[in-house]
Curated annotation (Swiss-Prot):
Keywords assigned by UniProt, alphabetized: Flavonoid biosynthesis, Isomerase
Site feature: Important for catalytic activity: 108
Annotated EC: 5.5.1.6
Gene coding for it: CHI1
Protein name per UniProt: Chalcone--flavanone isomerase A
Enzyme class: isomerase
Pathway: Secondary metabolite biosynthesis; flavonoid biosynthesis
Other facts noted in the record for this chain: Part of the biosynthetic pathway for all classes of flavonoids, a large class of secondary plant metabolites, many of which are brightly colored.
UniProt binding sites for substrate: 50, 115, 192
Length: 241
């Protein structure tokens, strides 16, 4: 067996993102694929609203390696297809959105819902099922408020389940506040952050940089194991340091 790949924690503003997590809605350990802020230019000043961490199940590494090993961080950053593979790949994802500035659940959920519906209608995939899923999504957030340091967390199952959790501190464990079964909505949350029109270019670049390095390491280790064929998938576990 190849030696484990280690991933490090990251700091975004005053908020730390652990190298690995065991989130609500999952029995697996997911590793930190990248982190960054979300902000907007307001009256000539860039204002940061949230710090975002993106975690992936370790099976993401061999899956992504099939197409993306050997690519540079810049090549991955510039590739819409790479981020689509991250969003839609057959492995779990976990996204933690931590408030830098206060935000109400209504403000957050309405913006996410608006972007999702516009995208689905634009590509012709909006149905009654998506409409019902959006209503459930809005209901979950309706009475919530998120002060600085509070987090919204999403666990995305490849089966199409979206587990939503809230925390007032840096905890990522505990019980789920809601589970919504809709594959398009499940994928849309992460897509809205690191996809083609993602709201966090910083998180997007971070994911590209860290995944490129993990693919590089896994490929080098795979090739060095007693003539192991290049096409054989790696089963390298990911641990935190």
């Amino acid at each position: 067996m190849s030696p484990p790949v280690s991933v490090t924690k990251m700091q975004v503003e005053n908020y730390a993102f652990a190298p690995t997590v065991n989130p609500a809605g999952s029995t697996n350990t997911l590793f930190l694929a990248g982190a960054g802020h979300r902000g907007l230019e307001i009256e000539g000043k860039f204002v940061k609203f949230t710090a975002i961490g993106v975690y992936l199940e370790e099976s993401a590494i061999p899956f992504l390696a099939e197409k993306w090993k050997g690519k540079t961080p810049q090549e991955l950053t510039d590739s819409v297809e790479f981020f689509r593979d991250v969003v839609t790949g057959p492995f779990e994802k976990f996204t933690r959105v931590t408030m830098i500035l206060p935000l109400t659940g209504k403000q957050y959920s309405e913006k996410v819902a608006e972007n999702c519906v516009a995208h689905w209608k634009g590509i012709g995939t909006y149905t009654d099922d998506e409409g019902r899923a959006i209503e459930k999504f809005l209901d979950v957030f309706r009475s919530e408020t998120f002060p600085p340091g509070a987090s919204i967390m999403f666990t995305q199952s490849p089966l199409g389940l979206l587990t939503i959790s809230f925390a007032k501190d840096d905890s990522v464990t505990g019980t789920a506040n809601a589970v919504i079964e809709n594959k398009q909505l499940s994928e849309a949350v992460l897509e809205s952050i690191i996809g083609k029109h993602g709201v966090s270019p910083a998180a997007k670049c971070s994911v590209a940089e860290r995944v490129a390095e993990l693919l590089k390491k896994s490929y080098a280790e795979e090739a060095s194991v007693f003539g192991k064929p290049e096409t054989e998938k790696s089963t390298i576990p990911v641990i935190g340091v």
